[in-house]
């Protein structure tokens, strides 16, 4: 209940004045109704921000065949509904302990979900589907690291961990069996994120060329400008970048 979160907030602030309190809310937290009550998460004294499940849903929707326009609309809705400080402190997730592994979700079809529990427990993507899933996961990570918010990696996703629902998504880290190319890709994204302050606090603008399989947006701050383009389609796409 709100009263508990308020007490938790006050206790955390007494211990550490700049404590950050992130809530686990799967939906739009600005108008969340739970147990027949509208929650007051962002009205002061409760949550500083929340886990960005709407971003996760938008990423998977886009990479699994949805349109870039729908992705942009989903994110604009969250931006309009959330206070700016909340929006820029969102916990950007692609995988969590409550979801099937990102790599699995980006590679399986409906048929695999119909397998019995034992089948799902031992399932590994075949090479052709694994290659597709890895490409999609790299695109998902680019979006995760370049949208406003703090990118948060569920251990093992960066190493190519697979698994369906709990408990198959909670296996131990694959020490000695990591996908080294994927791991290097994530490390590079971490470096870029740490070096580019614009990714932390820059404005977000979706491009007019965002359409269909091409998602394009910009992060800008002062004289700094970053253009992010993600093409999930099977055809090469040219997109023009105007000079500052």
Language model region names:
Residues 207-243:
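Carbohydrate-binding surface patches
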